[in-house]
């Protein structure tokens, strides 16, 4: 009974990819990979399984969302929950050997356990880049500009990139709150976009009216470069002001790249990825309720693999990007050759000739078809090779 119950079911959060969606993903993946390589990034693959003690611990994904298992030697393994930590491992151990910038890219599935009521995929495809070894703001601008270029190449119409700086938020919170516990509470509200909860908590704490106003004013710091000077008035520390200055430099470089019109500053932007140390960003499309991609600077991550190096990068969610793109043309050019046994050799020869021309061709024996009318609707055209002498038809 239990076997029948689960016969057509999938584990929680797992999804099938049917032919139409697979073809659409392939097209999107292809144009993005081509653009990434044009920018000089090299693709890399890492194992699906990693050690929990290394990549699992270095990942910013919460422990309860990791898929864990034991190997035969008793080591705890995890299905990779993101690609940044595995690439940091590879770079630290094998590739980042001379201290010069390293540009890597990836296209892979990642795995994150979901709650039953969450309704989100536990396995999803990401495509992205990591720029390792360059600590300049220009490097941050490069990966943001590349991300914008990728989205334009896919045909995505309207999207916006929100950019912030975790160093600014942390500096402001430390100045006013004085401890990490309170700061983490407010960061969680900001990540969840729960601004009502944020305001209520700020007002419930015994803070001066000036400090309350500073924390509340943070929520209004969104827009163009004019918010940078406003942001600097809320902080007194050098760290906070330096973070704001980095955003000013970033916007200037993005204007040089010609992508500044797609970018808006959001000084209250934070991420659930705890390894971000500086500039961070998210990209949104009107048709999707969640970010379709995110990224930022993570200068401390490679140190966990005993190879300190600055780094920045981003990842795009292919499933959400497909949803944002919406209706699009997918290749529907498969031809079919239906043949009887007497015409097998002729059918094979014709199929091979068409395939050599780059066409997609199905070769189908007439005896294997139950409903010829329904079957013929699947293909752009059908060639019939039937009977001993036969008669060709379209």
UniProtKB/Swiss-Prot annotation:
InterPro entries hit by this protein: aa-tRNA-synth_II, aa-tRNA-synth_II/BPL/LPL, HisRS-like_core, HisRS/HisZ, HisZ, HisZ-C
Pathway entry: Amino-acid biosynthesis; L-histidine biosynthesis; L-histidine from 5-phospho-alpha-D-ribose 1-diphosphate: step 1/9
One GO process term, biological-process aspect: histidyl-tRNA aminoacylation
Gene3D superfamilies noted in UniProt: 3.40.50.12590, Bira Bifunctional Protein, Domain 2
CDD domains referenced in this protein's UniProt entry, alphabetically: HisRS-like_core
One GO cellular component, as annotated: cytoplasm
Annotated keywords: Amino-acid biosynthesis, Cytoplasm, Histidine biosynthesis
Top-level lineage group: Bacteria
UniProt subcellular location: Cytoplasm
GO molecular function (one): histidine-tRNA ligase activity
UniProt main location, coarse: cytoplasm
Key word Cytoplasm present: yes
Pfam families documented for this protein: HisZ-like, tRNA-synt_His
Described function: Required for the first step of histidine biosynthesis. May allow the feedback regulation of ATP phosphoribosyltransferase activity by histidine.
Misc: This function is generally fulfilled by the C-terminal part of HisG, which is missing in some bacteria such as this one.
Family affiliation: Belongs to the class-II aminoacyl-tRNA synthetase family. HisZ subfamily.
SUBUNIT field: Heteromultimer composed of HisG and HisZ subunits.
Name this protein carries in UniProt: ATP phosphoribosyltransferase regulatory subunit
Organism, as annotated: Geobacillus kaustophilus (strain HTA426)
């Amino acid at each position: 009974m239990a076997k029948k119950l689960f016969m057509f079911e999938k584990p929680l959060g797992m999804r099938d990819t049917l032919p139409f969606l697979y073809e659409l993903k392939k097209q999107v993946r292809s144009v993005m990979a081509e653009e990434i390589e044009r920018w000089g990034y090299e693709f890399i693959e890492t194992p699906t399984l990693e050690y929990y003690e290394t990549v699992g611990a270095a990942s910013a994904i919460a422990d309860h969302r990791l898929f864990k298992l034991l190997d035969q030697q008793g080591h705890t393994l995890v299905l990779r929950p993101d690609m940044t930590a595995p690439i940091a491992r590879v770079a630290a151990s094998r590739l980042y050997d001379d201290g010069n910038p390293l540009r890597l890219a990836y296209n892979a599935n990642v795995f994150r356990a979901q709650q039953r009521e969450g309704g989100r995929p536990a396995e999803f495809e990401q495509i992205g880049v990591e720029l390792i070894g360059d600590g300049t703001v220009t490097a941050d601008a490069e990966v943001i500009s590349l991300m914008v270029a990728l989205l334009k190449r896919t045909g995505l119409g309207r999207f916006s990139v929100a950019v912030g700086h975790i160093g600014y938020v942390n500096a402001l919170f430390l100045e006013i709150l004085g401890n990490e516990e309170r700061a983490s509470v407010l960061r969680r509200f900001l990540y969840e976009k729960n601004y009502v909860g944020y305001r209520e908590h700020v007002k419930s704490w015994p803070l001066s009216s000036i400090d309350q106003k500073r924390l509340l004013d943070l929520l209004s710091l969104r827009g163009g470069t004019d918010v940078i000077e406003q942001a600097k008035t809320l902080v007194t520390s050098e760290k906070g002001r330096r973070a704001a200055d980095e955003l000013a430099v970033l916007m200037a470089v993005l204007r040089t790249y010609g992508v500044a019109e797609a970018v808006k500053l959001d000084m209250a932007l934070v991420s659930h990825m705890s390894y971000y140390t500086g500039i961070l960003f998210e990209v949104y499309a009107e048709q999707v309720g969640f970010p379709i991609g995110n990224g930022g600077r993570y200068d401390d991550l490679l140190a966990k693999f005993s190879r300190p190096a600055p780094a920045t990068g981003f990842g795009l969610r292919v499933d959400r990007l497909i949803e944002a793109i919406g209706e699009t043309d997918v290749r529907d050019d498969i031809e079919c050759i239906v043949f009887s046994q007497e015409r097998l050799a002729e059918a094979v020869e014709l199929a091979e000739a068409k395939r050599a021309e780059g066409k997609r061709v199905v070769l189908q024996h007439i005896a294997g078809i139950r409903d010829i009318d329904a079957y013929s609707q699947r293909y752009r055209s059908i060639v019939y090779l039937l009977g001993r002498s036969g008669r060709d038809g379209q």
